From Swiss-Prot:
Biased segments, Basic and acidic residues type: 266-278
Protein name in UniProt: Myc proto-oncogene protein
Quaternary structure note: Efficient DNA binding requires dimerization with another bHLH protein. Binds DNA as a heterodimer with MAX. Interacts with TAF1C and SPAG9. Interacts with PARP10. Interacts with KDM5A and KDM5B. Interacts (when phosphorylated at Thr-58 and Ser-62) with FBXW7. Interacts with PIM2. Interacts with RIOX1. The heterodimer MYC:MAX interacts with ABI1; the interaction may enhance MYC:MAX transcriptional activity. Interacts with TRIM6. Interacts with NPM1; the binary complex is recruited to the promoter of MYC target genes and enhances their transcription.
Keywords: Acetylation, Activator, Chromosome, Cytoplasm, DNA-binding, Glycoprotein, Isopeptide bond, Nucleus, Phosphoprotein, Proto-oncogene, Transcription, Transcription regulation, Ubl conjugation
GO BP, sorted A to Z: chromatin remodeling; chromosome organization; DNA damage response; G1/S transition of mitotic cell cycle; intracellular iron ion homeostasis; MAPK cascade; negative regulation of apoptotic process; negative regulation of cell division
Native species: Pan paniscus
Amino acid sequence: MPLNVSFTNRNYDLDYDSVQPYFYCDEEENFYQQQQQSELQPPAPSEDIWKKFELLPTPPLSPSRRSGLCSPSYVAVTPFSLRGDNDGGGGSFSTADQLEMVTELLGGDMVNQSFICDPDDETFIKNIIIQDCMWSGFSAAAKLVSEKLASYQAARKDSGSPNPARGHSVCSTSSLYLQDLSAAASECIDPSVVFPYPLNDGSSPKSCPSQDSSAFSPSSDSLLSSTESSPQGSPEPLVLHEETPPTTSSDSEEEQEDEEEIDVVSVEKRQAPGKRSESGSPSAGGHSKPPHSPLVLKRCHVSTHQHNYAAPPSTRKDYPAAKRVKLDSVRVLRQISNNRKCTSPRSSDTEENDKRRTHNVLERQRRNELKRSFFALRDQIPELENNEKAPKVVILKKATAYILSVQAEEQKLISEEDLLRKRREQLKHKLEQLRNSCA
């Protein structure tokens, strides 16, 4: 799609100047010139997207993984000395000069978010395209950094001397700058996992050039700590690996905080500091490690092992020998008591079953006897004598009425018996009188 330019003169040089800010690797281009040309031409979509949609500014960029500086195969084994004199190892920059360079380069946020690298490198173009596609606006920061880097490189060329120890000092400074950067980069996700083409083209370890590439740590406190830790009198070799960077105070605090947190990767994460402390110790001969760290791969992939919820919870803990003996004795006693408890419930259950069985037998006998007594009572009642289906309530009512009638009859019979007895007594007395009169 052609770009609509508001120029009246159709000059190809002017057209190229208007489109020139869209090219990435132009070290002589001024970043602030785009603001002056914004009235003459429309801005780039990647630069104007936040103003167009009114979104928040981009988050800080993650540290990039360049093949020239912080590739996993890069190893720097150089003596380091901060003395500016000729006796202490040939250092060309003093501590004040180095700190001034770091503070000037770390002054702006745009420089803090970018990583200084060789602009002629092929991976630099790839990384610029990646960062611009992902974060939108990385190219402008890279231009500003490349301009400042070019000025410092020119200053180094002017103040250059044929002293061969100067290259070693510059390599040592850049290796010091790479310490915290490699420590931060080992915690990041490897871009080769995400992107199809390899970012680290050069697998062989490269020497540290003083003009093409230089890396600065994102904080000056780590530089001070590293310079104070190294002795000034005797040069000490520094071995820098990407996977196992030397642990600083901030790294140890972050590792302690990571150990306190519980996550999916906590087991692998806690095993890493021990390995770092072993490999981060200074040694004379440094060997390159495989390009990809297993820690990075573990951070990329979440563990797929799931907890077996059907299994009983494991309460196993490691105790000293004395505590283990006590716990074993306690366990034996508990097993004995549990066995006793298990035997007593069994005996009690059998006793209860026997009691229930005898109770059922007795209850059945009582019901049979009650039924027989009801049948006998029914047979005594003349009204229900032939009624085999008479209910118990009817039997009881009829029996009560029959008993009352029988009692009334009994009273009548008793009264009649008394009358008959009196009559008999009277007749006996009259018979005796007749016998006495006849005699």
